[in-house]
């Protein structure tokens, strides 16, 4: 990134509509590398650093020269990008061509370019002289989207901007695909990746390190936001390597069914969803049922003497005594004394969603816009509510998050408990979350960090003095109390295989994290910085941000104010051009946020420049909607 741009800002105010200095510095780098040099870039910015806005600002710059195609994982994230595109446009302060920008979900892009599951090669010519931006790029490989991206790269010879806060999902294989997509050479994976008998023995070898450094030199942008404006994280439970884990000791009932399930799988259980199920809760005949829909149709089917299922509805005293789930027993007991909002991660949405819904209802927590809990717990005279988010939710997710994130819900009085499967691990932002729970162990530690990153990020908390509590729950045997302090104690299979599934999973993830961290440190070292005058294509964007910062602290100045002129000439060296720019923003009534007047416009009054507050007003029930296409980004759901 261009550190010369960062040096232009002093005590940057982040609390107003703004482009952060590192975002502008990165934008400069992207313009130079992708537009000027036609080279691909991996934007490896850690979660919460504002990758989306950087990408959209770049798309606006690039739209003046080329067509820009933006690919996002799903329809919900597409909505987020479309919303943020409006934010980026308002901050851009320069010309762009909106109809040159196309935003697609991966599924819609697939349907646009495939006929009967075969790539329509004749149609790929439309992508000549274009740029592709791929959000969550680590997720596109191993499927048709990844195949299509490779074909487009080879056929059209175009650059890619790949966004990822965690470019290695499970093994270095993902990084190998990223290298292949970004470089002009074909990668032989067998030469750069060494494979052992286990997944955790998949490593980037020395040749792979050299290939990485050679092919991606000058193509990596790494950034991690300083944590100075974040609340303290308080991890609960006993020490487990470099983190903390809450041991939830199973009852005899849960442990019995847990062991039956594990023996059925012959200990080959690391990725089997049934082990995720029974580690969360046991449900008798449901434990080994891969198609739950068949059992959901049963009438008054007994799972245990005090637990039955009827047409997909669980009922019985066991939902309160909770011998079926050591994790939920801990959770239900703990939340009774906690204040604030909760975010709870779980996997296997069908099984997990069933368990969660009826345990919560039976223990006095009401479903948001749904069933009321038994003897409901109250807050401010209203029932404490929960919602369950899964991939099946599409149209309602955005509205649900609006309620959860609203200032009126900071205390959880509107919606207190948000349960979510993997759909919430990427791209979404949660606000004022005080308790984060893991009901199941994530597949990777990058996913674990992504889930934390949905909540613990800059601008998500009004009061950062209050800590955020994290509970990583592990179901363990009734007599299991091992202290896990070193990976070196668990190098032999016979020692690992007898461990509870959750503990084994955590160790497995930690082994993989060693390789991930090694590669991340290489990428971090490859990220280049330089100090140059800003690229001509972003000068107006940069000046707009400098002006916003200046007039936040200045409500009224002389028209020939030396500080304002000095600030503008730090970018536009010619004083006459700088004065002309000042004339333009005053006569054009540039929009600023002032600490006294809030939303304001710049005006000339006699020999002064003043900030004039404004408010939009309209007649009741009278709205004007502008449908001119030059104001609308072309998009497809």
From Swiss-Prot:
A Pfam family annotated for this UniProt entry: ResIII
Gene3D superfamilies given in the database record: P-loop containing nucleotide triphosphate hydrolases
Molecular function via GO: ATP binding; DNA binding; helicase activity; hydrolase activity
Helicase ATP-binding domain mapped to chain residues: 32-185
Broad class of enzyme this protein falls into: hydrolase
Q: What is its main location?
A: virion
Positions occupied by motif DEXH box:
135-138
Write the record's keywords in alphabetical order, separated by commas.
Answer: Activator, ATP-binding, DNA-binding, Helicase, Hydrolase, Late protein, Nucleotide-binding, Transcription, Transcription regulation, Virion
> SMART domains given for it?
DEXDc, HELICc
Positions of ATP binding: 45-52
Record-listed E.C. numbers: 3.6.4.-
Q: Describe the location of the Helicase C-terminal domain by residue ranges.
A: 327-507
Note whether Coiled coil occurs among the keywords: no
A GO term from the CC aspect: virion component
**Cellular localization per UniProt:** Virion
**Which cysteine-cysteine pairs are annotated as disulfide bonds in the entry?**
none
What InterPro entries has UniProt attached to this entry?
A: DNA/RNA_helicase_DEAH_CS (IPR002464), Helicase/UvrB_N (IPR006935), Helicase_ATP-bd (IPR014001), Helicase_C-like (IPR001650), P-loop_NTPase (IPR027417)
Q: How does it assemble?
A: Heterodimer of a 70 kDa and a 82 kDa subunit. Part of the early transcription complex composed of ETF, RAP94/OPG109, and the DNA-directed RNA polymerase.
Q: What does the protein in this record do?
A: Acts with RNA polymerase to initiate transcription from early gene promoters. Is recruited by the RPO-associated protein of 94 kDa RAP94/OPG109 to form the early transcription complex, which also contains the core RNA polymerase. ETF heterodimer binds to early gene promoters.
Q: Which family does it belong to?
A: Belongs to the helicase family. VETF subfamily.
Name this protein carries in UniProt: Early transcription factor 70 kDa subunit
Source organism: Vaccinia virus (strain Ankara)
| Encoding gene, per UniProt annotation | OPG118
